[in-house]
UniProtKB/Swiss-Prot annotation:
It comes from the Eukaryota. It is found in: Golgi apparatus membrane; Cell membrane. One of its GO terms (molecular function) is sugar transmembrane transporter activity. This is Sugar transporter SWEET1. It holds the Pfam family MtN3_slv. The gene is swt-1. Residues 259-273 have a biased composition (Basic and acidic residues). The keyword Transmembrane helix applies.
Length: 293
């Protein structure tokens, strides 16, 4: 039974971890669109190559095929991201020096393990790299707590980190590997803290958190407030005159124009049928144009 659970968990951990490695593709697409790396840091890619290489050597030394498959794919993806980052980085000197340092560290580790294979020493180093990677989002948590909102936290990434960390923590318990349990347990704890912030804090400023909305729904505070506002007249809006629809307005204008035209024709007909009579009256003014004979 344990073997079946371990196989299912291995397949699930491989799938979710490889899917998490593909999160670098949107970053590379953004770099390509803007034509340069800009403010994007290449350190996560370098740390991915470094940590993946150490974990790959750890898996080879332990002959753990689940770790071997995951870290082969991980090192390949992170190496491709590093090459892509190097192409678009200006100037290239800084990132090239960092890449040489990482490559030298990996080479030294491979030579050291070849002459002195020690699983415990390598496990401690791998565990340290994992804890450093999981501790990187702590700066983002500081920003969230300072702003009292979670708009800067990516929810899909937090959920993915929780799934991957919890699966590897359970996998470490099944294979009884403390070097897998400790870093992934810390990562799972940090992921739970991040996910809890989505419940406690609002998504954006001037919004209510889901926890506050749920509390108001249970206590009926919002309903009581609305009823109180209705009683005091705060929610009553002043009545505004109804706006006549445009089609009705046009029909009224046409009807008024037709009535005005009909009234004008009726007045003209009355004038023609009954013209006004003018009474002639003698003028007392002498006719200055008549010639007396």
């Amino acid at each position: 039974m344990i073997e079946v659970v371990l196989q299912v968990l291995s397949i699930s951990a491989i799938t979710t971890t490889i899917a998490l490695f593909f999160c670098g593709i949107p970053i590379c697409m953004q770099i390509r669109r803007q034509g340069a790396v800009g403010d994007i840091s290449g350190v996560p890619f370098l740390m991915g190559v470094l940590g993946g290489s150490f974990w790959l050597r750890y898996g080879l030394l332990k002959m753990d095929y689940t770790m071997i498959i995951v870290n082969v794919v991980g090192v390949f993806c992170m190496a491709v991201y590093c090459i892509f980052f190097l192409i678009y980085s200006l100037p290239k000197k800084t990132f090239t020096c960092q890449l040489i340092l990482v490559t030298s560290t990996i080479t030294g580790m491979v030579v050291w393990i070849a002459f002195k294979p020690n699983l415990d020493y390598l496990g401690i180093i791998c565990m340290t790299f994992n804890i450093m990677n999981f501790g990187a989002p702590l700066a983002g948590l500081g920003v969230v707590l300072r702003n009292r909102e979670v708009s800067t936290l990516p929810l899909p990434m937090c959920v993915a980190n929780f799934l991957v960390s919890s699966q590897w923590c359970l996998y470490g318990n099944l294979v009884q590997d403390i070097y897998i349990i400790i870093p992934n347990g810390i990562g799972m704890f940090l992921a739970i803290v991040q996910l809890s912030l989505f419940i406690v804090l609002p998504r954006r400023e001037n919004e209510k958190s889901p926890l506050e909305q749920l509390a108001n729904w249970f206590t009926g505070r919002d309903r009581n407030k609305k009823e109180k506002d209705l009683e005091t007249g705060e929610c009553a809006e002043p009545s505004s005159p109804q706006k006549i629809p445009s089609d009705v307005h046009e029909k009224l204008e046409k009807l008024m124009a037709a009535e005005a035209s009909s009234e004008s024709r009726r007045c003209s007909a009355d004038f023609m049928d009954h013209p006004p009579s003018y009474k002639s009256r003698s003028s007392s003014v002498p006719d200055i144009f008549s010639v007396q004979s």
